[in-house]
């Protein structure tokens, strides 16, 4: 890869030299996920946004040795986008317009929200406590444009799927060679979750079998929209599903509906929709700060009793175990979660995709840290006074 970007570096010099374009395409570079999520919150759209973000990876530690395992990260696509810019001499958006949108007659596809809005872009939504709210003005982070920020419609994406199902041909134009399309859809790296094989990932597509029929697919989302593409290559059938809402406040409906339709196109029964409690968990999130407030009043009530009746104030092991260390655990856990989210950049991802969870984490984590210190000090002060 350093052939195209000689200056490219991650924290490990050997890994920097080993990474190839194919590693990026197959998501086997070892680059981690959450730094790419944090990059989505960088809305600097001045020239050179992609190169700035890629240069910022010079201190990044990779997740696994290069080429050894599949680990999805949008950083791979952002680096690939920069390679496209470097080798073509064109901005990524211009390259996509000239070499994909124009030849595929994708006349309602855009790289900026402003252009898409002028053509009637649907209003996107984010979920707060599993309820959808309009979010029409989330900008596109220019530095992450190559990793999934392009805007399209069902008709245009149908043109894209036609080329993928027709050996790279659309109308009279050969957009990509038939061998190139076969390589894209081959699947190169095992995708495992919880140790179980999900499918094979390669060059943007997940290859799986439904029954004995091979299908390829890819889903994705931005904070206020989500999408799914599915193909049955041998039958030359495909589906595109576009949803003007993010999926994080709901079960994974975009993917499950998309895979269900793909299964039907393959002549197979769709998998049942999984029972998902995420939306109910999200609705219960406001109970966390409420329970914290209840805990404060309960503690103050106990402390007032101890102050009025010093004789009932416990001491020794009971004081430390039951009244100090045990209550410290949930408070320090909540505070620790917030510290972890901020130190790893996870908070930026949560801000964009799960704003309700982000605010609960900030409020409850900050409150828990402050209250843990204050509560311990109050108890120790009263214990010394009592005895």
Give a label for each model feature.
Residues 1-4, 17-21, 46, 50-53, ...:
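Stable alpha-helical elements in mature extracytoplasmic
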Residues 13, 17, 45-49, 68, ...:
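Residue-level signature of the cytosolic catalytic core of signaling kinases
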Residues 90, 97-98, 138-387:
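Catalytic loop of the DD-peptidase/beta-lactamase superfamily, centered on the K-T-G motif
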Residues 2-3, 41-65, 90-107, 127-136:
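Short, charged, amphipathic alpha-helices and their helix-cap/turn boundaries
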Residues 77-85, 236:
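Active-site SXXK
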Residues 9-14, 38-44, 65-69, 83-86, ...:
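Second-shell loop/turn segments in exported
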Residues 36-40, 69-70, 113-114, 196-200:
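Short coil/turn segments at secondary-structure boundaries
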Residues 1-36, 59, 82, 86-124, ...:
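Active-site helix/loop module of the DD-peptidase/beta-lactamase fold
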């Amino acid at each position: 890869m350093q052939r195209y970007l000689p200056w490219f570096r991650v924290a490990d010099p050997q890994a920097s030299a080993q990474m190839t374009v194919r590693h990026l395409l197959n998501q086997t570079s070892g680059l981690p996920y959450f730094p790419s999520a944090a990059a989505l919150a960088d809305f600097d759209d001045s020239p050179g946004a992609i190169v700035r973000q890629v240069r910022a990876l010079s201190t990044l530690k990779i997740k696994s040795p290069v080429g050894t395992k599949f680990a999805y990260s949008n950083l791979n696509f952002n680096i690939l986008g920069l390679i496209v810019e470097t080798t073509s001499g064109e901005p990524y958006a211009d390259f996509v317009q000239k070499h994909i949108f124009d030849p595929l007659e994708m006349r309602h596809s855009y790289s900026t929200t402003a252009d898409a809005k002028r053509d009637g872009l649907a209003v996107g939504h984010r979920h707060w406590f599993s309820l959808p709210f309009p979010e029409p003005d989330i900008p596109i982070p220019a530095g992450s444009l190559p990793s999934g920020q392009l805007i399209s419609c069902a008709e245009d994406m149908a043109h894209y799927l036609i080329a993928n199902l027709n050996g790279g041909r659309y109308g009279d134009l050969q957009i990509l060679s038939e061998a190139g399309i076969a390589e894209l859809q081959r699947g190169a790296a095992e995708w495992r979750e919880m140790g179980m094989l999900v499918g094979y990932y390669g060059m943007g597509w997940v290859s799986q079998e439904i029954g004995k029929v091979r299908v390829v697919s890819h889903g994705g989302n931005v904070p206020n929209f989500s999408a799914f593409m599915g193909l049955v290559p041998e039958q030359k059938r495909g589906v595109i599903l576009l949803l003007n809402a993010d999926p994080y406040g709901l079960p994974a409906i975009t993917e499950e509906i998309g895979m269900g339709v793909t299964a039907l196109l393959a002549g197979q029964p769709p998998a049942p929709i999984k029972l998902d409690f995420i939306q109910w968990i999200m609705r219960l999130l406001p109970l966390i700060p409420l329970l914290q407030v209840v805990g404060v009043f309960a503690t103050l009530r106990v402390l007032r009793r101890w102050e009025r009746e010093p004789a009932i104030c416990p001491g020794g092991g009971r004081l430390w175990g039951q009244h100090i260390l045990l209550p410290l655990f949930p408070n320090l856990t909540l505070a620790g979660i917030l510290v972890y989210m901020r130190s790893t950049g996870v908070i930026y991802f949560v801000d964009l995709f799960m704003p309700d969870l982000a605010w609960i984490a900030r409020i409850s984590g900050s409150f828990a840290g402050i209250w843990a210190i204050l509560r311990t000090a109050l108890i120790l002060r009263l214990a010394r006074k009592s005895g």
